[in-house]
Amino acid sequence: MKGSHINHGGVAGNTPIGGEHNHDTIGMLTLDAQGRLAASCTTSGMSYKMHGRVGDSPIIGAGIFVDGEVGAAVCTGVGEIAMRTVASFLVVEKMRGGATAQQACEEAIARMIKITGDPKQVQVGLLALSPGGKVGAFAIQSGFTYALGNSSGNKMHEALHAI
């Protein structure tokens, strides 16, 4: 979202040097040879954030969630929306209800769009993995990329998006 004026929830009136809100989250999902799912999540945080703000990344259910029998999900973007919808948990629960990893991500993003008011002002991306190795990825806007790695190698992908 380089050069955009998307509201990332920072303190009003503060503009980073260069005019960009440089921050992002790295979410990792893995499925081992025994079929066990795991996830991890780290974030650089948001520039000019409100003092004491806790983002979604460390909150189980918002930024990261795993149920070994159902699936795993991670979320990046505007943490307030991820927390409000319990995004990663929502994705895994959609999978529990029969949705594919992709369908679950799309349904969770649809719910986020419904509550945001103006989805053009926010970005959230979701990544999900099923115990069978099926991947889902979806975002509100373009620009959400993810990497897949397996014994055949690594490849970058751009997630589908709603707007």
PLM features: what roles do these ranges have?
Residues 1-163:
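N-terminal nucleophile
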